[in-house]
Every structure is written in structure tokens, then in C-alpha cells.
UniProtKB/Swiss-Prot annotation:
Keywords: Aminoacyl-tRNA synthetase, ATP-binding, Cytoplasm, Ligase, Nucleotide-binding, Protein biosynthesis. PROSITE patterns: AA_TRNA_LIGASE_II. PANTHER family: MITOCHONDRIAL RIBOSOME PROTEIN L39/PROLYL-TRNA LIGASE FAMILY MEMBER (PTHR42753), PROLINE--TRNA LIGASE (PTHR42753:SF2). It catalyses: tRNA(Pro) + L-proline + ATP = L-prolyl-tRNA(Pro) + AMP + diphosphate. It comes from the Bacteria. Catalyzes the attachment of proline to tRNA(Pro) in a two-step reaction: proline is first activated by ATP to form Pro-AMP and then transferred to the acceptor end of tRNA(Pro). Belongs to the class-II aminoacyl-tRNA synthetase family. ProS type 2 subfamily. Its main location: cytoplasm. This is Proline--tRNA ligase. Transmembrane segments: none annotated. It is an enzyme of class 6 (ligase). Gene3D superfamilies: Anticodon-binding domain, Bira Bifunctional Protein, Domain 2.
Length: 443
């Protein structure tokens, strides 16, 4: 992509009402534009990152055996009355009446819809287990939307729902999602700590939040320090028949709790050097809630004994759009965003220091075409802006690599390469730089 043809409305200063770093940088980098309180348009740069995060989530859900579908954003109020949540949900639910006076709502979550789909289709225990997931826009009418995409009213969410015959099967489904979450967050360069959490309006008796530690986190969290650096399990697991409980036990045996579930006495019993109290950002939340929805909505299957039994359910959410904010909060400097390569909007930014100079233009074109041919995503700044402005923009938008082409270097047969994360620069021939950049990505 050439900057001269791209839509990248960067700002020199963040609006005064942007309170946290991620909100400030997303606005300055031309990733989003606020259309109303808590509602944003996703501009091209932001959408590229959003799509990459969504794809990682999709790949890890598929790997863990979940099946994707797409549920409606507008839901029937009657379904929520069946579950008993319509009146309980409160003012966060946006309620709608259509021209026929039917009561509808803009879905804040989808337990009722997916249960309705399940009960119409699955009748026997032989068809279990099932895990259905959906990546869809949700709406919750927050009283005080703030912090940009971190606490907006409209947001993109992945929500998965498991259906099992009994509690043992439900726990296995829960464990699969628990481990899948560890992997998907690690692929985005995040250190997400699973913490025992309150179930809230979703319900159930087992729940974990996945928390990214950040000074701007909305809640206090408490955990054993070893959990922060514990590596992700990786993809090479037996997702169907393997026992994932030891992996879950490894993460849950050590103390970790959100503020609502915090046990100060148990936390203080840890050696002082092992205790970590911090602020955190919730990026995922998983629940096991038994028959909370299946019983009132009559989602039953015929068991091995021929009797009808309500299925055991769980739900598993990831804030896809919120993850952009969390990644920025965890990875930035005074110059701007530092994207992990796995989610960066482009892999490489080419900076032409003297647009219109024949030698510089030719070298940039060679690099641009070679990188694209190798499958790398490239943003080529071919504008007439000053060099300092080009550098500032590249640092702001956080591309992992910057390839800098100037007349002095070209005369000496070299170009400059800068690594955004470390700030390291070195010069080399264009051929050797391109050889390095066309190799496989790392996070």
C-alpha cells in the first residue's frame, strides 16, 4: 500500500478527552473515529489490526474444536424472558420495538439465542459434545463509556458456548477453552493471567477472567508472580482425547483473583516476594453454569438411559476490539505504538527520504515489489512530507520494521533498517536487508 493512496488521518495531538494511552494513540494513529459516546468508526489501519486479532481468535477456536456460526445482533425479547434474564439485565440492555410492536433487543450476549438454536437441532447425547462460537458486534448501554475501545458501548466479541451431557464433560469443555485462551493471548504478545472471578449476571459456579497487567487497568488484581511469566502450552496438544486438566491445574494452583474474589488472608500467606498486586485489563472471561439456561429453556437431550436431561453449558468470551487497547497499553513508548508482528497492520514501512530522486525512487520500488512478492504487507511512504514527519508517523503507527532509503545511503550502496521494538538501527545493502525481511515472521 502506498501512503499517497491510503487513508491514514493521523493527528499531532490526542483530543483532550482521551484519558488513557491506548485511546490517545488509536485516535492519533488514525485507527478509529468517535461517532457517538462509546461508538467508533473503525478506519483502515484499525480495521487491519482488528481483522488480524479476529483471525488469531478464530484459528485457536477452530484448533480447540469449536464450530463457528453467526448469530443475529437483534434478538427476541421473548427468548430472554424464557431464561428469566430480560428484566434482570438492567439498563445496559438496549431494548427495541419494531413496527409491529414486537419487543426486540440489541444483544449484549447470546446465551439465549444459541440455546434456542441448540434445542431445535440436537436431540441425543450421541451428538454431544458441541461448542459453537460467534464473532459478532455487541451493544451494552454503559452508563459512562470511557477509555476508547476499552469500555465502549458497541464492541466486537467472540463468544463460544459449550453443550455437554454431564458435569464431567462440561469441565473438559471448560478446560479446552481455558487452554485455548492461553495460546491465543500469547500469540498476540500478551501475558494474560487467568484469575478466579465472579460470575455476575451470566451465572454459574465456575469462572475465570484472563487479565493483562497494565497501570491503566480498570480493576485491582492479585496473583502469584510466577503466573505472569508462565509460558503458553502451545498448539501441539490432543484437543479431543487429551487430558488438559494438568495444564489448568498448573495455572490455578497458584493464587490469582480479581478484586471481587480476593481473599486477603490467603494472599498474605504467600511469601512476600511472590505476591503481586497490580491493575489489570480483562480480555477474556469464561464460565461454566450448568443448567442455568438449558432448564428454563428446555434444552434437553435423550441420555443413554432414554431419559430427557438438560444439557450442561458453558460460555467463553473474548473482547476482540478491546484487545487492541490492551495490546497498546502493554506495548508502547513515547513515540507511539509497538505492535507485535502477529497483529501489526503492516509488516514493514518503507520511508523514501527524498521522493522524486530517481535513485531513491528506484530503490524503494524495488523493495516494495520484492516484499509484496514475498507475501509481506508493506506501507510505502511515497509522499512529499519531510523526513522527520515520516519517521514520526512510522513510530506512531508502530510497524515492526522501517526500511529507510536516502540519497546518501544509496550513493554508498546501503539502506537503513530500524526495528521498532528495540529501536536498533543498522545499515546494509538493499539485497541483504530484503533477504532478512522476507524471512518468516516472529512475534
Amino acid at each position: 500500500m502506498r501512503s499517497s493512496r491510503y487513508f491514514l488521518p493521523v493527528l499531532k495531538e490526542a483530543p483532550s478527552d482521551a484519558q488513557i494511552v491506548s485511546h490517545q494513540l488509536m485516535l492519533r494513529a488514525g485507527m478509529i473515529r468517535q461517532e457517538a459516546a462509546g461508538i467508533y468508526a473503525w478506519l483502515p489501519l484499525g480495521l487491519r489490526v482488528l481483522n488480524k486479532i479476529e483471525q488469531i481468535v478464530r484459528e485457536e477456536m477452530d484448533r480447540a474444536g469449536a464450530i463457528e456460526l453467526l448469530m443475529p445482533t437483534i434478538q427476541l425479547a421473548d427468548l430472554w424472558r424464557e431464561s428469566g434474564r430480560y428484566d434482570d439485565y438492567g439498563d445496559e440492555m438496549l431494548r427495541i420495538t419494531d413496527r409491529h410492536k414486537r419487543e426486540l433487543l440489541f444483544g449484549p450476549t447470546a446465551e439465549e439465542v444459541v440455546t434456542d438454536i441448540f434445542r431445535a437441532s440436537i436431540k441425543s447425547y450421541k451428538d454431544l459434545p458441541k461448542n459453537l462460537y460467534n464473532i459478532q458486534w455487541k451493544f451494552r448501554d454503559e452508563r459512562r463509556p470511557r477509555f476508547g475501545v476499552m469500555r465502549g458501548r458497541e464492541f466486537l466479541m467472540k463468544d463460544a458456548y459449550s453443550f455437554d451431557l454431564d458435569a464431567d464433560g462440561a469441565r473438559k469443555s471448560y478446560n479446552r477453552m481455558f487452554v485455548a485462551y492461553l495460546n491465543l493471548f500469547a500469540r498476540m504478545g500478551l501475558k494474560a493471567v487467568p484469575m478466579r472471578a465472579d460470575t455476575g449476571p451470566i451465572g454459574g459456579d465456575l469462572s475465570h477472567e484472563f487479565i493483562v497487567l497494565a497501570e491503566t487497568g480498570e480493576s485491582a488484581v492479585f496473583c502469584h508472580k510466577d503466573l505472569v511469566e508462565m509460558p503458553a502450552p502451545g498448539p501441539d496438544l490432543d484437543w479431543i482425547n487429551g487430558d488438559l486438566q494438568p495444564l489448568v491445574n498448573q495455572r490455578t494452583a497458584l493464587y490469582a483473583a480479581t478484586e471481587e474474589m480476593h481473599d486477603e488472608a490467603a494472599f498474605n500467606a504467600l511469601p512476600e516476594g511472590d505476591r503481586l498486586s497490580a491493575r489489570g485489563i480483562e480480555v477474556g472471561h469464561i464460565f461454566s453454569f450448568g443448567t442455568k439456561y438449558s432448564e428454563p429453556m428446555k434444552a434437553t437431550v435423550q441420555g443413554p438411559d432414554g431419559q430427557q436431561v438438560p444439557v450442561q453449558m458453558g460460555s467463553y468470551g473474548v473482547g476482540v476490539s478491546r484487545l487492541l487497547g490492551a495490546i497498546i497499553e502493554a506495548s508502547h513508548d513515547e513515540g507511539g505504538i509497538i505492535w507485535p508482528e502477529s497483529v501489526a497492520p503492516f509488516d514493514v514501512g518503507i520511508v523514501n527520504m527524498r521522493q522524486g530522486d530517481a535513485a531513491c525512487d528506484a530503490a524503494c520500488e524495488t523493495a516494495y515489489n520484492a516484499l509484496k512478492a514475498a507475501g509481506r504487507e508493506v506501507l510505502y511512504d511515497d509522499t512529499d512530507a519531510r523526513g522527520g514527519a515520516k519517521f514520526a508517523t512510522m513510530d506512531l503507527i508502530g510497524l515492526p520494521w522501517q526500511l529507510i532509503v536516502g540519497p546518501k545511503g544509496i550513493a554508498e550502496g546501503v539502506v537503513e533498517i530500524k526495528h521498532r521494538k528495540t529501536g536498533e538501527r543498522h545499515t546494509a545493502s538493499l539485497e541483504s536487508v530484503l533477504d532478512g525481511l522476507t524471512k518468516s515472521k516472529t512475534t
